Amino acid sequence: MKFLFYLSADNLEIARKEVLVLAERYGWVEDYQFEERLLLLDYAGEKFFERLAYTNEVTKIYDICSVSELEQVFSEIPVYDRLCCVRVKGGKGKTALERKLGALLWKRGAKVSVSNPEIVYKVYIQDDKCYVGLLEFERDTRQFFLRRPDRRPFLMPSAIKPKLARALVNLTGVLEGETLLDPMCGTGSFLIEAGLMGINPIGIDFIEKIVRGCRVNLEYYGIEGSVLLGDAKNLPLRDESVRGIATDYPYLRSTKAAGTLDELYSKTSEEFERVLKKGGRAAIVTNIDVESFFSNFEIEMKTEERVHGSLTRRIYLLRR
């Protein structure tokens, strides 16, 4: 079965990898193709679309055709006894095309409603290629606004925003009921997103005030999780006890509480390797290149996001 993912433009590397990691964990990927913001996935398995952060829409593909063949496709595509409309992305004159294709459906007995459709026929135009199908999922962007860091009871500056936090949790491939660790949890951005997806979150921080505040934030969102006082360099966890790790490293060159960052990275790398299950992933955010510290891991992805003039985040996906 083919699905087309219309990806967020925020970061295509993250968007593509997020889809592929989850698809591999929930089912079987037969094939996939990238074309700018489009990802065509031949997939069989459980649907995971509600988890996605960096995908705007998912459409179940009916046909792939040229622009000149669109009317023929819409003369054959199934119609249903429910309100429907046609929505087009890409190409020129999309409003006129939506009306023309909607009229073809109406002539075939479809109930057309632009304002309140129950079924949406999607057409994505890329050059002369058209992807035609039925909309399966559309991301509600309000959820991220409602969960932004400044709306939490416990606040800290520079907290990771919910959209990126959810994407990085997804990059680890952790499923419902499995355990995700954030060993430098701060206000709990990763833990919140993990908990809302049915994942068991464990957070650790070395400052007692932050541990208490993070617990308050989890309780605010109705999330059951463990937040412990501890040191990321010496994790109070058993070997191979977590399925994934997502964390945001401190950005200063050194910190009084944690020692030098070189020490922090070298020791946390050892601890990540110890507590991660074999094949488990760690999604980490940092402001320095860390390949030398994680030489025992496979680097599946490295990308960058500019935060402001003096800060560019590096985002790594590491596999044990």
Swiss-Prot record:
It catalyses: guanosine(10) in tRNA + 2 S-adenosyl-L-methionine = N(2)-dimethylguanosine(10) in tRNA + 2 S-adenosyl-L-homocysteine + 2 H(+). It holds the Pfam family UPF0020. GO terms for biological process: tRNA methylation. It comes from the Archaea. It is found in: Cytoplasm. GO terms for cellular component: cytoplasm. Residues 46-136 form the THUMP domain. InterPro entries: RlmKL-like_Mtase, RlmKL-like_Mtase_CS, SAM-dependent_MTases_sf, THUMP_dom, TrmG10. Belongs to the methyltransferase superfamily. Trm-G10 family. This is tRNA (guanine(10)-N2)-dimethyltransferase. It comes from Archaeoglobus fulgidus (strain ATCC 49558 / DSM 4304 / JCM 9628 / NBRC 100126 / VC-16).
